């Protein structure tokens, strides 16, 4: 968690401008916004308290449209801070929700606004959409009627210090306006409010404003959804730092509840050029765990989710301040949660279902920024709940947003057990046992030429037979090879160790060429051998292992997480023998 605090607000500010808030309440606020705008642009009848001509009191302002405001109209760029005291929040959510506030900031580079909750500068952010809606609520406090010019008992309207919501609006020029928000009127359509400001009369005497107002219905709607709401309703439900879709991930790791890593991916740029030959040019990530595989196109499309990785609503923010010094001697702080709060959302340590960690860059020169999220299991209400370690929040998440949590590991990977282009195969060896017990083993040596930035196989020779074979049927054989696909995970109770002590049912070896330095491979390429071994454990299924052997003798691989269909191996064995014998055969796509 310590490392997750090493970040700057400017990083997020550069990306928040791409986000569209998903919280349902903002839709309501947007409607309210146009109601407020309409009130400012249309002529309305001036509020009156008697049949006599309405007279403005000190501090009140009438705008050109005819609307009358408790204090002057404010633009979003005028705002510096908004501080709110709402004692009613203590009973429903706790003491930390009573006093809260928003700091407004402006990013000169991006020409966009962003903000954060005061006291949570590195945790709780608001994007420009939310700030605009909030600013509209406090910037145009329109009243429909002045109830009383001088009030002697504010408690009648819920405007006494003990019960009212107190809002303090601080401007960039240092001016401050204070507004108290009390009860709703009997019909429930409008709030009673009063100003907490001091004004000066025409004689130069200063006094506290004591008038009580009834807000317009549009302003009431806005206030109810922002100032009078819980602070969590205004927060951007980000689960992690946004990912630049053009750069993707530098790391991606998904763990199960028991701490076992289900998937670990790295970008193709992080592996050797020789390894890339086995992935072709279409994959974006290769697997560190399970090793030897490449990411599937199904996962690649999920990068769009992480560009704006959000839930639907912030439910809680951390209230327990934790401070300390990290291993580098730097001070850190973060806000943690009480155990009962975590338990409420299925996020206590014994019930966390998934842990997701990834890192990403915002540009090529930037240092990768780490994100970490803990997920509950799917809860009875039909949602996941996520604990963001970056933002110290608990967020409600629609299952559609994180559908990949329910994937099997194989769903993240390419189905093809062996991805390699025919032009990058210098030597292909096939070894298997026929039904009569005889063993077939042959190596096919391919000669390739560079043509239009691609190596094209021109001829192929069977090594043992010492015979040149048909290129047409070599291509058919290679299609059979690439059609061997992963079909699922092997049973958890399978004794893989004992199985792999036996002779493999089938074996495939592919060795890439050694390429000298050229325009296509400026640094040259050493040869790499990829070995697939298949161990049959039922009549129709065979466990597959992957081993990569580098030119320097070092190896890496994966020991049997998935299975393939034996029928596909049998077809390849039969066709390889027909190929050597000069017999006709054809690729069969279906198993």
Model-identified regions with their sequence ranges:
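Soluble, acidic/polar mature domains that operate outside membranes
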Residues: 2-591
């Amino acid at each position: 968690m310590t490392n997750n605090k090493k970040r700057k607000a400017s990083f997020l500010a550069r990306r928040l401008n791409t986000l569209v808030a998903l919280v349902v309440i903002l839709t309501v606020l947007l409607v309210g916004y146009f109601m407020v705008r309409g009130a400012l642009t249309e002529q309305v009848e001036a509020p009156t308290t008697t049949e006599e001509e309405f007279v403005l009191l000190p501090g009140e302002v009438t705008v050109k449209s005819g609307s009358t405001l408790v204090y002057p109209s404010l633009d979003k760029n005028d705002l510096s801070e908004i501080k709110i005291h709402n004692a009613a929040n203590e009973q429903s959510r706790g003491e930390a929700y009573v006093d809260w506030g928003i700091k407004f900031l402006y990013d000169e580079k991006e020409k966009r606004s962003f903000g954060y909750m005061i006291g949570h500068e590195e945790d709780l952010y608001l994007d420009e959409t939310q700030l605009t809606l909030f600013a509209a609520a406090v910037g145009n406090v329109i009243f429909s009627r002045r109830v009383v010019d001088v009030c002697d008992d504010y408690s009648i309207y819920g405007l006494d210090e003990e019960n009212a919501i107190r809002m303090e609006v601080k401007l960039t020029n240092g001016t401050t306006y204070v507004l108290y928000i009390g009860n709703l009127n009997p019909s429930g359509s409008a709030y009673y409010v009063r100003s907490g400001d001091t004004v000066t009369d025409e004689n130069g005497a200063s006094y506290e404003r004591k008038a009580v107002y009834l807000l317009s219905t549009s302003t009431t709607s806005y206030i109810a959804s922002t100032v009078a709401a819980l602070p969590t309703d205004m927060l951007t439900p980000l689960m992690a730092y946004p990912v630049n879709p053009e750069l993707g991930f530098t790391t991606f790791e998904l763990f199960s509840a028991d701490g076992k890593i289900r998937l670990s991916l790295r970008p193709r740029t992080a592996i050797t050029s020789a390894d890339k030959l086995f992935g072709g040019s279409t994959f974006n990530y290769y697997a560190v765990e399970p090793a030897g595989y490449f990411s599937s196109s199904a996962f690649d499309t999920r990068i769009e989710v992480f560009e704006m990785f959000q839930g639907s609503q912030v439910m809680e923010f951390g209230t327990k301040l934790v401070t300390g010094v990290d291993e580098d001697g730097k001070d850190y702080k973060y806000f943690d949660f009480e155990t009962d709060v975590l338990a409420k959302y299925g996020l206590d340590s014994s019930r966390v279902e998934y842990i997701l960690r990834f890192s990403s860059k915002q540009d090529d020169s930037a240092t990768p920024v780490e994100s970490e999220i803990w997920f509950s299991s799917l809860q009875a209400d039909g949602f996941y709940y996520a604990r963001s370690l970056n933002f110290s929040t608990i967020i409600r998440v629609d299952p559609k947003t994180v559908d990949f949590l329910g994937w099997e590991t194989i769903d993240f990977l390419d189905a093809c057990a062996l991805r390699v282009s025919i032009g990058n195969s210098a030597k292909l060896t096939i070894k298997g046992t026929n039904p009569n017990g005889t063993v077939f083993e042959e190596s096919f040596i391919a000669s390739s030429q560079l043509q239009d930035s691609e190596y094209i196989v021109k001829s192929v020779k069977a090594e043992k037979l010492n015979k040149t074979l048909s290129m047409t049927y070599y291509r058919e054989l290679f299609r059979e090879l690439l059609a061997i696909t992963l079909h699922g995970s092997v049973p958890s109770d399978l004794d893989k160790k004992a199985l792999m002590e036996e002779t493999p049912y089938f074996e495939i070896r592919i060795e890439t060429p050694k390429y000298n330095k050229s325009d296509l491979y400026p640094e040259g390429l050493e040869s790499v051998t990829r070995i697939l071994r298949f161990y049959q454990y039922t009549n129709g299924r065979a466990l597959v292992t992957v081993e990569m052997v580098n030119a320097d003798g070092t190896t890496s691989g994966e020991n049997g997480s998935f299975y393939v269909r034996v029928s596909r191996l049998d077809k390849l064995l039969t066709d390889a023998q027909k190929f050597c014998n000069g017999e006709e055969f054809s690729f069969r796509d279906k198993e």
